[in-house]
Each structure stands twice: as structure tokens, then as C-alpha cells.
């Protein structure tokens, strides 16, 4: 599934990332607010859905090779976090949907979870 498709399914706003980056393919998704779980279970090239908007999310994404983060529940990171994501080439999205609904919509549309991936 492309980032653009994810954006459309979640009716999300692009916080950082250009049109070319939105064509990137994402293999699977994960909804999580506990960054230690992200490091334990998530695979590379995964979409992370989270309600956390601090710098730690960006650093965790970098370590886990996550290319896209979508903030749920209308959360918006501050400028410092957005700038850090741009430096690390991490695409940021934002949706008004809660995490459960976001995960459900994406799963229904065919995006698998990390437990189902390779």
C-alpha cells in the first residue's frame, strides 16, 4: 500500500513528506504508544500509528527503520519534532481518527500487521 493510499484511507494531513515520497510502498502497519514495544516487534518499512508526538518517536522510528509515522487523535507534533523527522527522512501524517479505527480501516483495506509480515 502506498503512503498516498494510507493518507486517503485515514483522511490524513501530510505534515512532512513530498508527493514523490507519498508514492513509497509500505508493507505493514503497527499501532503503538510504547516505544519499547515498537523496538521489540516492529519490522522495517512499517507504518507506525501513535498518539505520542515527542522526539523519542522519531529516534525510535530511525532505529527501527520506520519510514512513516501517523499521529492519531488529531495530535500534532511541535516544530522541533517535525524538523527532526525531515532530517531523518521520515514522513509524518496526522489523522483525527483514534488509533483503533485507524488500524481497523487500514487492515480492512489490506495493510497487514507486523505479526503477519515476513
List PLM regions with ranges.
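An N-cap/entry alpha-helix motif that binds or orients negatively charged groups
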Residues: 7-29
Amino acid at each position: 500500500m502506498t503512503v498516498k493510499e494510507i493518507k486517503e484511507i485515514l483522511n490524513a494531513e501530510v505534515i512532512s513528506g513530498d508527493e514523490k515520497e507519498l508514492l513509497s510502498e509500505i508493507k505493514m502497519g503497527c499501532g503503538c504508544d510504547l516505544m519499547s514495544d515498537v523496538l521489540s516487534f516492529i519490522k522495517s518499512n512499517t507504518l507506525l500509528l501513535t498518539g505520542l508526538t515527542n522526539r523519542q518517536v522519531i529516534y525510535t522510528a530511525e532505529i527501527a527503520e520506520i519510514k512513516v509515522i501517523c499521529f492519531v487523535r488529531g495530535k500534532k507534533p511541535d516544530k522541533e519534532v517535525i524538523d527532526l523527522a525531515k532530517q531523518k527522512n521520515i514522513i509524518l501524517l496526522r489523522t483525527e481518527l483514534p488509533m483503533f479505527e485507524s488500524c481497523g480501516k487500514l487492515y480492512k483495506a489490506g495493510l497487514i500487521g507486523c505479526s503477519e509480515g515476513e
